[in-house]
Amino acid sequence: MIRISFLPFLCSALLLTQTGASGKEMPSPYPAPEPGVRLTPPESPAPVLNEPRLFGARPGSPIQFAICASGERPMSFAAAKLPPGVKLNRETGVITGKISRPGTYSFPVQISNGHGKTNGTITIRIGQEMCLTPPMGWSSWYSYSGGVSQENILKTARLLVSSGLAQYGYRYVNIDDCWQGARGGKYRAIQPNKRFPDMKSMCREIHSLGLKAGIYSTPWMGTYAGYMGGTSPNPQGDYSSLALPENKRPQPDQLFGGCPGSQRLGAAKIGPVWMVTQDARQWAEWGFDYVKMDWYLIDVPSTERIAADLKKSGRDIVLSVSNSTPFEIAGPISKTANVWRTTGDIEDHWGSLKKIASSQEKWQPYAGPGHWNDPDMLQIGRLGKVGKANTTFKPTRLTPDEQYFQMSFWAMISAPLIISCDLEPVSYTHLRAHETRRH
């Protein structure tokens, strides 16, 4: 059973910005924006231990698990009977190290500050399952989208911490489409474009904040946004036979143009040469913890092959597959992927929310520790235009009630909670809405 309490931070945060949307199927024009509302109670200054309290890793894999606790800083973390091979940073609450022996390790923790203390239990499970709780974090797709860069990824990572969202479990910082450059390096893997000068140092900084890093790809030859994918027309990784001339590309590395360029040019399919294997090695070497693999139709053999490549990469990397998983393969997909999209792309209007929410019941038997249904990202806060290099953002078109509905429903069905808004202009007060606790 899941008990949900909306704490002070995320939904009222993004809800207190002005919003305008309709409860109907996209009428035009929309009604005048409604004033923001706040339904969540104020945050306690005393320590509160939030979810997740359960973490999974494979034997011998690097562990980085942040104890999520809200309350006034500075705060002190203590743990008794830590399993051999890991240590706790008493100031940040981040547990790091490696555990070689399979098993379940539970240990008590105490968190204290000037207003009091709280106690709880953390469990680390070492085996073949990871992602034992639904992922929570942020993705670039509905905000920076085609303008995603190392600079705005690191800015968002710092804002997740400084805003307090990380204290409620929002720990993944995920790069979506549009980061890709050409193939190269020792693995002949996809290298980043010029907006990402140093992936390894970026991941290192994200980890230093107690967060985790995510990346995006596809088993197609081209992504939805027209960038290089995980398969190739030839062993050399040369896509020139399919690509647009450079002077016709929206961005230099956008080989196939904007969506639906990959479909139009024949790149929206799995190519004859599989290169995900070397891409996975590169992601692991850079330090990524999560990958979204995006294609249609999702199929079991490709998913199994991707999962095997990630497992061989030498790093625990969560596998999220997108989009529109056929329900007929829910069983085998739920045994292979950690996260799978149950829908197409969500939009910030009631018609989209209603359609998605109404279709989720049949998926529920397939969700559980390590494997989660994904009805797509939260449409809360200030959003950009998908696929565009956004530098300005507009408030979501969802009404405050619709935003609270999405937060509540997604939490009740144990869905991933991935926000995708621009966090920079969101004030401390505005961040009161995404702080959802699951028990």
List PLM regions with ranges.
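Aromatic-lined carbohydrate-binding/catalytic grooves of carbohydrate-active enzymes
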Residues: 156, 160-290, 295, 300
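Strand-loop-strand motifs at the edges of beta-sheets in extracellular beta-sandwich domains
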Residues: 85-101
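An acidic-aromatic substrate-binding cleft motif
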Residues: 125-150
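A short beta-strand micro-motif common to beta-rich folds, especially ectodomain repeats
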Residues: 67, 103-113
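Glycan-recognition surfaces
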Residues: 250-255, 265-268, 301, 316-422
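Solvent-exposed loop segments of extracellular immunoglobulin-like
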Residues: 73-77
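Conserved small/polar residues in nucleotide/adenosyl-binding loops
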Residues: 429-439
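Extracellular interdomain linkers/hinges and stalk-like, low-complexity segments
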Residues: 25-71, 116-134
